[in-house]
Amino acid sequence: MSQSGEENLQGSWVELHFSNGNGSSVPASVSIYNGDMEKILLDAQHESGRSSSKSSHCDSPPRSQTPQDTNRAEIDSHSFGEKNSTLSEEDYIERRREVESILKKNSDWIWDWSSRPENIPPKEFLFKHPKRTATLSMRNTSVMKKGGIFSADFLKVFLPSLLLSHLLAIGLGIYIGRRLTTSTSTF
């Protein structure tokens, strides 16, 4: 794009024109509101910007005048004088009521959203893992530290528990084996 083309844009708005077959072009941004809703929203944004700009964390540069804004201002100034020629008085009032009802319905969630507290995490937001003081290992027990597997303290606990677990396993095996042999012989 040439330098003069970029200077003509003066912002991020681009106006597109479509031809309707007979050679005349129609702007793509034709709305039934003719920018009234946008003007109301911009006014509300400017009013809220005055009160909240001091506490705003993100200061942005002021918005520059775009070609679409200047065209819209010219159209709006002509539309007030030509209001009776394009629309009847009743249609104009009905359209204004529709716009106001839409703005009332949509403004509640905007107000709730904009007045909520900021989600700012604390400055010292570090995860601290708990230190393991005692691991579940036989090597770290006091019995193993004293004399190992063949110490008297370890053998006093380990051998009776080993013997008891084997006796329970043998007894359970014999009991289940007898139940199975008696149940198969009755069939």
UniProtKB/Swiss-Prot annotation:
Listed A to Z, the keywords are: Apoptosis, Membrane, Mitochondrion, Mitochondrion outer membrane, Phosphoprotein, Transmembrane, Transmembrane helix
Task: Tell whether NAD is among the UniProt keywords.
Answer: no
Annotated region (Disordered), positions in chain: 42-86
Residues annotated as transmembrane: 157-177
Location within or outside the cell: Mitochondrion; Mitochondrion outer membrane
Phosphoserine modification, residue list: S48, S60, S77, S79, S85, S88
UniProt lists compositionally biased (Low complexity) regions at 50-63
Residue spans with biased composition (Basic and acidic residues)? 71-81
- Report the superkingdom from the record: Eukaryota
GO cellular component, as recorded: cytoplasm; dendrite; endoplasmic reticulum membrane; mitochondrial membrane; mitochondrial outer membrane; mitochondrion; nuclear envelope; nucleoplasm
- Which intervals of this chain are the motif BH3? 93-118
Entry function: Apoptosis-inducing protein that can overcome BCL2 suppression. May play a role in repartitioning calcium between the two major intracellular calcium stores in association with BCL2. Involved in mitochondrial quality control via its interaction with SPATA18/MIEAP: in response to mitochondrial damage, participates in mitochondrial protein catabolic process (also named MALM) leading to the degradation of damaged proteins inside mitochondria.
Q: Assembly and partners? A: Homodimer. Binds to BCL2. Interacts with BNIP3L and ACAA2. Interacts (via BH3 domain) with SPATA18 (via coiled-coil domains). Interacts with BOK; promotes BOK oligomerization. Interacts with PPTC7; this interaction promotes BNIP3 degradation.
UniProt name for this protein: BCL2/adenovirus E1B 19 kDa protein-interacting protein 3
Q: By which gene is this protein encoded?
A: Bnip3
